[in-house]
Amino acid sequence: MRPWLLALLLLAAGAAALAAGLSWTVRRRDLVRRPEERRVGFGFRKTLLIYQPSNRGRVNAIAWELARTLARAGHTVTLNVPSPVLTYDPAEYDLLVFGGSAYLGSVGRPLKDYLASLRFRGKQVLLFVVGDLERAPEMAGLRLCVPAGNQVRSIKIRPDEGKKLCQFAQASV
């Protein structure tokens, strides 16, 4: 076989593998998971924390760290993943928190769809995105899902900056 033909075949195989990997990542990002409500803390303020789990579990750990921090600050935190079957009424909560991982410039479709389906006004909303890149185009897409008339604060953190998110949340509430 000629060297240039072999190089061309290897290049095509590599491109196909990359495309398959990206497709797999996007499908995993947009996977609707089974809801499983957890409660953390017994405070006077009520917080709803909905997060899109990440493929590697980093966001799960960050969400739990944030829930424990808010509980220590006097919140009862209801923790769950986004799903069309959730029936939470945002009016019952003092703080609404939504977050997830950034993949290819966007957060998971289930989180955006769930957030866009909610109707609420006059609420304190905290958005967080976990990703490795400094730029945050995914935050703009997530912010567009929040109805007008709410106080929205947002932050993008790296996977190892859970404490930074917790400090941000404490300063925001």
How should these model regions be labeled?
Residues 84-88:
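Short acidic active-site motifs
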Residues 2-47, 58-78, 90-173:
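FMN-binding flavodoxin-like domain, especially the glycine-rich phosphate-binding loop
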